[in-house]
Amino acid sequence: MSRTNISALSPMQKLARNPAVIAMTLALALAGCANKKNMPNSAGELGLGGAGSATPGSQQDFTVNVGDRIFFDTDSTSIRADAQQTLQRQAQWLSRYPNYAITVEGHADERGTREYNLALGARRAAATRDFLASQGVPASRMKTISYGKEKPVAVCDDISCWSQNRRAVTVLGGAGM
């Protein structure tokens, strides 16, 4: 291994070999990264997680401020009270933004056969669609699909995972605003 003659190095190369300069550069870089998520973006909104970060009428607005999913009890298609509130907010939002069409996805937990869970997911999606229709959302703007147990959001052999997978998700489509 050959040693480099320090006097032959440029001033930049000499600085790059100085441990204090390296540590200071690293500290400044990390400090800049730590504050980035709190900086306003070009639209004048707060960054991720900040109040007002969702553009009104956007998918993010729908998901964050309204809620895009509801949950079901085991082997049930009944719309629970907490789910009714979410679906009422969805109906109001969809009334405000009439150019969106939606797809209601029905899901089930991993227990049971594939066929049973596809049918259960279809019934959950239909129950969700029917509730939204009862709140004034035109049927022509809605379609349903069942994924059964094929698209879990949580995978484990535990009731906490199963309860997250028993859901209906409202997905926006169409032209939007």
Curated annotation (Swiss-Prot):
Record protein name field: Peptidoglycan-associated lipoprotein
Keyword terms of this UniProt record: Cell cycle, Cell division, Cell outer membrane, Lipoprotein, Membrane, Palmitate, Signal
Superkingdom assignment: Bacteria
Family stated for the protein in its record: Belongs to the Pal lipoprotein family.
Subunit structure: The Tol-Pal system is composed of five core proteins: the inner membrane proteins TolA, TolQ and TolR, the periplasmic protein TolB and the outer membrane protein Pal. They form a network linking the inner and outer membranes and the peptidoglycan layer.
Lipidation (N-palmitoyl cysteine): 33
Signal sequence region: 1-32
Gene Ontology terms: biological process: cell division
InterPro entries: Bact_OuterMem_StrucFunc, OMP_bac, OmpA-like, OMPA-like_CS, OmpA-like_sf, Pal, Pal_lipo_C
Organism for this UniProt entry: Agrobacterium fabrum (strain C58 / ATCC 33970) (Agrobacterium tumefaciens (strain C58))
Protein purpose: Part of the Tol-Pal system, which plays a role in outer membrane invagination during cell division and is important for maintaining outer membrane integrity.
UniProt GO cellular component terms: cell outer membrane
Covalent lipid sites (S-diacylglycerol cysteine): 33
SUPFAM superfamilies attached to this UniProt entry: OmpA-like
Keyword Protease: no
Domain OmpA-like: 59-176
Recorded topology in the membrane: Lipid-anchor
UniProt main location, coarse: membrane
Keyword hit for Cell division: yes
Compartments (UniProt record): Cell outer membrane
